[in-house]
């Protein structure tokens, strides 16, 4: 059991930490069982400080409590049950996932980008339903090639934006954007979307 825990710690370190001073970059492909166990350890946290990427064999990545201050690309579906923060100057790229769930705090002070590498794909389901969703940086999604409707749901207890939120969805299959009442001091731009929203202050 002790050896297994040590291997787990090493896997986490390789996946989420890089030696920025040397410019090294690590790419890790880990089973969902290993990744999901991260969230069961209350003291587990991670910091991506340089150029990293995460993927898993079954297409689902379970993010631990994480602060991202460098560039991190996550490929596939993402489940985050603990707080995720993209620090100023950091970038989180969510690549080729059909579902993203953030059920704790999501704070974007840098850049969070939803991207696809294929010309056509199924629409994305993106759900933020934790305590706090805060954007002072840039949140953008480019879904113009979706062949089914993309669904974006921003329904946290507290939703504040002083940055830029941009959702460009498919013309062929209009997406749906649902948001709870929120405070806006930035820019929220949508295209090809059906809106289901609460009140907005600060416009």
Swiss-Prot record:
Residues 185-203 form a propeptide. The keyword Transferase does not apply. The keyword Membrane applies. GO terms for cellular component: plasma membrane; side of membrane. Its main location: membrane. Glycans are attached at residues 28, 138. Keywords: Cell membrane, Glycoprotein, GPI-anchor, Lipoprotein, Membrane, Signal. Residues 1-23 form the signal peptide. It is a lipid-anchor; GPI-anchor. It is found in: Cell membrane. Coiled coil: none annotated. A lipid is attached at residue 184 (GPI-anchor amidated asparagine). This is Putative GPI-anchored protein YAR066W.
